[in-house]
């Protein structure tokens, strides 16, 4: 199992913060070619978000996720639309089952801790729920739940595509 650590996420975030618009555009062009189904689905769903900042959050989160996995493996096989739909539907049903009586933080933490990439999923949740900031989330409760499931699906599929080797991303390597 490959693990993306908090240090690796911080390192990738630091790199993104120092990119200009042309560099970010080039990265996004590469993403669109490498993972068209994932990028298309996530960005397509983000168009439905009510708040522009939420759409920016989605693009930022997806950038961190895709760059994190690119650090593990340069040429990740593309996720197909069928793979995404099947995985997303299964994930959505599982989350509905777990949270059918409402949100329970203990259940949520258990899901994150047992996930294939717990620190990456925790990062996603922190951005979506705006943890650590005094401001409220840019997402409605329904939007937040949907995008947690979407990103959990994206992470799980990319994790699967990068193979079973045990490795940690070393941010000092970058």
Regions found by a protein language model. Give the residues of each.
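Long compositionally biased, domain-poor regions of proteins
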Residues: 1-5, 10-174
């Amino acid at each position: 199992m490959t693990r993306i650590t908090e240090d690796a996420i911080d390192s990738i975030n630091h790199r993104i913060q120092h990119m200009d618009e042309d560099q970010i555009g080039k990265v996004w062009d590469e993403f669109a070619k490498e993972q068209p189904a994932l990028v298309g689905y996530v960005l397509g769903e983000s168009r439905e978000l009510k708040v522009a900042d939420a759409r920016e959050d989605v693009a930022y989160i997806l950038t961190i996720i895709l760059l994190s996995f690119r650090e593990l493996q340069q040429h990740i096989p593309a996720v197909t639309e069928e793979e995404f739909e099947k995985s997303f539907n299964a994930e959505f049903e599982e989350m509905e089952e777990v949270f059918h009586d409402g949100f329970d933080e203990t259940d949520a933490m258990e899901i994150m801790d047992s996930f294939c990439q717990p620190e990456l999923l925790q990062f996603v949740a922190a951005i979506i729920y705006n943890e650590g900031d005094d401001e409220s989330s840019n997402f409605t409760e329904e939007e937040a739940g949907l995008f947690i499931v979407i990103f959990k699906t994206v992470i799980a599929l990319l994790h699967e595509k990068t193979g079973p080797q045990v490795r940690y991303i070393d941010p000092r390597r970058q």
